[in-house]
Regions:
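Non-catalytic DNA-recognition/assembly elements of restriction-modification systems
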Residues: 1-16, 28, 32, 140-162
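Sequence-specific dsDNA recognition surfaces
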Residues: 7-23, 36-68
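A short beta-turn/loop motif at secondary-structure boundaries
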Residues: 23-25, 88-89
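Short acidic/glycine-enriched loop/turn segments that link adjacent beta-strands
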Residues: 27-29, 91-92
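A short beta-sheet element
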Residues: 34-35, 50-115, 134
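Short glycine-enriched loops at secondary-structure junctions
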Residues: 38-39, 78-79, 127
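Specificity-determining recognition surfaces
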Residues: 96, 114-143
Length: 162
């Protein structure tokens, strides 16, 4: 087992929101998640969102397309909702998403690992009215990672028990 900062094993990406004043940015074909979508998601993977955006909306916002298996973490209101992207999608700024370097960590393993770290993530978050987990705090958050074979073993066990 070896300790890593998240930034050493993942690319951390923040989300964004297109202007709500421009109708042509909304109701497109691109899944656009908010923490509310994860609050009602009872599965490990998420495939749909309440709201969608257009390609134009994506282009004119700080939202970025995330690949299948990106680890999605709500970073405010509340901190700690987790899911894996079941298809390409993007998120609002209430997320910090992680694209895993699979030479070090399997996305599904990181998903399970972070489920055990929600309290720690809340404890390091800042803010007076609403706590928020910044990109910098998440990037520097340390996790202990097993070798890939053991990670796969854990994932297999979790899949069988689900």
């Amino acid at each position: 087992m070896k300790e890593f900062k998240i930034k050493d094993i993942c690319e951390v990406i923040s989300g964004g929101t297109p202007s709500t004043k421009i109708n042509s940015y909304w109701n497109g074909d691109i899944i656009w998640l908010t923490p509310k979508d994860l609050s009602s998601n009872k599965n490990k993977r998420i495939y749909n969102s309440e709201e969608t955006i257009t390609e134009e909306g994506l282009t004119h916002s700080s939202a970025q397309m995330l690949p299948i298996n990106a680890v999605l973490l709500s970073s405010r209101a509340p901190i700690g909702y987790l899911a894996l992207a079941g298809k390409e999608l993007c998120t609002n700024q209430g997320f910090k998403s992680m694209i895993c370097n699979t030479d070090y960590v399997l996305p599904e393993y990181l998903y399970y690992l972070l489920q055990t770290k929600v309290e720690e993530l809340n404890n390091i978050s800042t803010g007076s009215t609403f706590k928020e987990l910044s990109g910098s705090l998440l990037k520097n958050f340390k996790v202990s990672i097993h070798d890939l074979d053991f990670q796969q073993h854990i994932v297999d066990i979790r899949r069988k028990s689900a």
